[in-house]
Amino acid sequence: NNYWDYGGDAIIDTNRYVMLTQDRRNETGWLWSRLPIEANDFEITSEFVMKGKSTTTGGDGFAMWLTTTRAQPGPVFGSMNRWNGLGIIFDTFPNQPHRGFFPRISVVENDGTKTYNTDSDGEKQDLAQCAMQLRHTPAETRLRFTYVKDVYMELAIQNQEWNQWNKCFRIPPVNLPGPPYLGFSASTGEVTDTHSIVSVWTNKIVYNSRTPADLDKEREQAFADDKSSHWWAIHQKKEARRAHEHGLISYMLIRFFISLAWLIKWLVILALVAGGSFVG
């Protein structure tokens, strides 16, 4: 194929699917685009299948990647750790007890320096998450990821009825290190599943020229129904936290210099007293 590479344990059934892993232990496979996504605003839709002999338990899961590097196998669902970009992780098996349900979908940003903790399933490392049934579903499972720069990014899942989309998250967008490559990877361990990518569509979203005021209005509309995830609410919290941190640093510096001045003062006094005693 001129547009995709695959590797690891991945198997291609031409014109049907790419099977990233079979329902076997300790397999990893990947599928990566050869060309990066050049568009600022885009939408990715993919049909995928996760199934196995067990109707109740499967593992480990798969991930969709938007990163600066491509086709680098590793320990995070078949792909490298410390990636630079965005990972959307479809985790079907908990490696430790968690509050909430599995399968769990989480979105994780990395700048290439942070280690994703697979033992804790990335606990407290995600930007957003949701739990949805992804195995043995009534309808074909599809994901739809929408990225509108400076406005929002959203993941929706089809799993119950055809063309009925359930929102997993809609949050302010990260700044993608661009242009990113699109990839999929999967892995199995002691618990197994077949992980297949049936189809992938990537579409550029085209807008007319927009002013800063237009972007403000789009943000307001994007988060109008979710005040907790409102763009400006999050922005204001970040600014307040930054101001608090800066204020705390300034306070600590002032205390340091006051303490230093106090120490110098008493050292001088002690030196004078000691000198007077010596002369006397």
What are these regions (language model features)?
Residues 1-280:
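Polar, low-complexity loop segments and adjacent catalytic/binding residues used for recognizing
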